[in-house]
């Protein structure tokens, strides 16, 4: 008989910070407002465009009124509403109101085309849409067909209600709702590691855990307090902003300064005027700050924390932006929508900070486990060896909506979420991202699914095959480019194809270059060999 070999134990990495108590039984809204007795009269939201201010007590009350208003419109516990909105105070009231009602918010990018919004409406089964008048045309026909109520936060067109109707509801008429910690509260859409966008089911327990991992405890990983002012420039339809700004900000009692869109001069003016202390950014904003000559005209000395996430930030860019914020600690976090979203965060942001290295994206968050695995064998790897990053903890998603197969592909039987990102953990527990297994293209932090663009390209009558891959771009990080096989006899041009795509997708999904080839490289099973195409781009060996 052969020797009995014990199974190899996983090499698991944990935070340098000790685990903490997390009140996972609380609904998200209760958790966010748990400290309201201490901050009730303090400014909670400031509308950067108008200067209008709401206290914590007002935000909490208006959110409960919206919950009652949703109930009066027939929204039941477990129903889904769509938020098709730019950053605004109403975004907070709507999301929190839905949470109080026991409903689910699915967040859509207002710049989506009508087809993209309707696809998400269909998939999420949303029963109500909260939007602005300028976006109503994208949804009105589908909403009329499916009897979906549209609510506008500004001048409501015909057949639409004004958001004030929700805010005027009597909060005392809201029926009691018993929320289970495993109930879904947010349904962002993500392409995951591959394929088309899917609904990511984030629960009350998951988001409470993720927020607590960042801002709770005696030595929070992300130290924020009630005297802080945090700028909300990242779109709230992105999970990074929804989690780090809306949820973490409310939990920590900070003042949240809302900006609808990024424009460098108004952005700098607001930082100076309101003495912003915390800036959650993405690399394109960091790049704009680093390169803009106007930055030096403004006093940015109030800023003490600059966080960057959603896409990797290079060491050179880190160093360049440090000079612009003389009193700030700059660091990165690492997230993925399916992970709730934060997997790792820079410990320079802690109340009792640690030394960090440039280029690192933090250490694994508390109350969670991380491992690095060999993508081929799934065996866990030691420090300083590159492999796929996996995370386990209560913060990760419940699964993909109505897609058990993709859920099983992403979360294994032992509860490990496989990110599709390649990285390593060094001797100081810091995580470095070096590559991606997954196919997703990151344009300015936005996800672009190659499969979605490939499916669209193949509807063009003169294209017989197509593949979409990323190309490195200094401003955007990555841009989508297409390799296209023309149908025999046709001479379709690059410009025609780019126009064909741009008419049907949101701006960040537009094709930047088209390369015509005789065939798309594929494996025997028919899978596109994207590495071969990426190698062509890297070497400059591109068809004319």
Swiss-Prot record:
GO BP term, example: phenylpropanoid metabolic process
Keywords of the record: ATP-binding, Ligase, Magnesium, Nucleotide-binding, Phenylpropanoid metabolism
Disulfide bond annotation, renumbered to this chain: none
First-level EC class: ligase
Pathway: Phytoalexin biosynthesis; 3,4',5-trihydroxystilbene biosynthesis; 3,4',5-trihydroxystilbene from trans-4-coumarate: step 1/2
Annotated spans, SBD1: 263-332
MF terms (GO), sorted A to Z: 4-coumarate-CoA ligase activity; ATP binding
Record-listed CoA binding positions: 261, 444-445
Binding site for (E)-4-coumaroyl-AMP: 240, 310, 332-333, 337, 345, 438, 442
Domain notes: Both substrate-binding domains (SBD1 and SBD2) are involved in the substrate recognition, and are sufficient to confer the substrate specificity.
Similarity-based family: Belongs to the ATP-dependent AMP-binding enzyme family.
Function: Carboxylate--CoA ligase that may use 4-coumarate as substrate. Follows a two-step reaction mechanism, wherein the carboxylate substrate first undergoes adenylation by ATP, followed by a thioesterification in the presence of CoA to yield the final CoA thioester.
Name of the protein described by the UniProt record: 4-coumarate--CoA ligase 2
Source organism (scientific name): Petroselinum crispum (Parsley)
């Amino acid at each position: 008989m052969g020797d009995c070999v014990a199974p190899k134990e996983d090499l698991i990495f944990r935070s340098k910070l000790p685990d903490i108590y997390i009140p996972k039984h609380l609904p998200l809204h209760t958790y966010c407002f748990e400290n309201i007795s201490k901050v009730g009269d303090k400014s909670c939201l400031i509308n950067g465009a108008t200067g209008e201010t709401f206290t914590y007590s007002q935000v909490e009350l208006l959110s409960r009124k919206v919950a009652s208003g949703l109930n009066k419109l027939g929204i039941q516990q477990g129903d889904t509403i769509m938020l098709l909105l730019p950053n605004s105070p109403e975004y907070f009231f709507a999301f929190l109101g839905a949470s109080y009602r026991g409903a689910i918010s699915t967040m859509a990018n207002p710049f989506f085309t009508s087809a993209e919004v309707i696809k998400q409406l269909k998939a999420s089964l949303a029963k109500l849409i909260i939007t602005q008048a300028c976006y109503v045309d994208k949804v009105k026909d589908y909403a009329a067909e499916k009897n979906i109520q549209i609510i506008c936060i500004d001048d409501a067109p015909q057949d639409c209600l004004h958001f004030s109707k929700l805010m005027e509801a009597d909060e005392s008429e809201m029926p009691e709702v018993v929320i289970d910690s495993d109930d879904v509260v947010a349904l962002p859409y993500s392409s995951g590691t591959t394929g088309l966008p899917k609904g990511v089911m984030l629960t009350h327990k998951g988001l409470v855990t993720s927020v607590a991992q960042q801002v709770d405890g005696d030595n929070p990983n992300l130290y924020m307090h009630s005297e802080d002012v945090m700028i909300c420039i990242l779109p709230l339809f992105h999970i990074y902003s929804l989690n780090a700004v809306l949820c973490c900000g409310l939990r920590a009692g900070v003042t949240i300064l809302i900006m609808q869109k990024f424009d460098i001069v108004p952005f700098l003016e607001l930082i100076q005027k309101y003495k912003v202390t915390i800036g959650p950014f993405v690399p394109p904003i960091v790049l704009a700050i680093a390169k803009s000559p106007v930055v030096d005209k403004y006093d940015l000395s109030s800023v003490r924390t600059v966080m960057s996430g959603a896409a990797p930030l290079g060491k050179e860019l880190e160093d360049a932006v440090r000079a612009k914020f003389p009193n700030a600690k700059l660091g990165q976090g690492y997230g993925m929508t399916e992970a709730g979203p934060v997997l790792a965060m820079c410990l320079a942001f802690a109340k009792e900070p640690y030394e960090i290295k440039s280029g690192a994206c933090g250490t694994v968050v508390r109350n969670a486990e991380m491992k690095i695995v060999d993508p081929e064998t799934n065996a866990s790897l030691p420090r300083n060896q590159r492999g796929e990053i996996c995370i386990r903890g209560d913060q990760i998603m419940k699964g993909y909506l109505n897609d058990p197969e993709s859920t099983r592909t992403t979360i294994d039987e032992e509860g490990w979420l496989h990110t599709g990102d390649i990285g390593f953990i060094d001797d100081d527990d810091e995580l470095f991202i070096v590559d991606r297994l997954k196919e997703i293209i990151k344009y300015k932090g936005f996800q672009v699914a190659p499969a979605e663009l490939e499916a669209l390209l193949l509807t063009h009558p003169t294209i017989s095959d197509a593949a979409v891959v990323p190309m490195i771009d200094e401003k955007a990080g990555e841009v989508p480019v297409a390799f296209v096989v023309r149908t025999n006899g046709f001479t379709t041009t690059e410009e025609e194809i780019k126009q064909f795509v741009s008419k049907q997708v949101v701006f960040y999904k537009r094709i930047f270059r088209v390369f015509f080839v005789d065939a798309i490289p594929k494996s025997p099973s028919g899978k596109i060999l994207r590495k071969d195409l990426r190698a062509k781009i890297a070497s400059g060996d591109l068809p004319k």
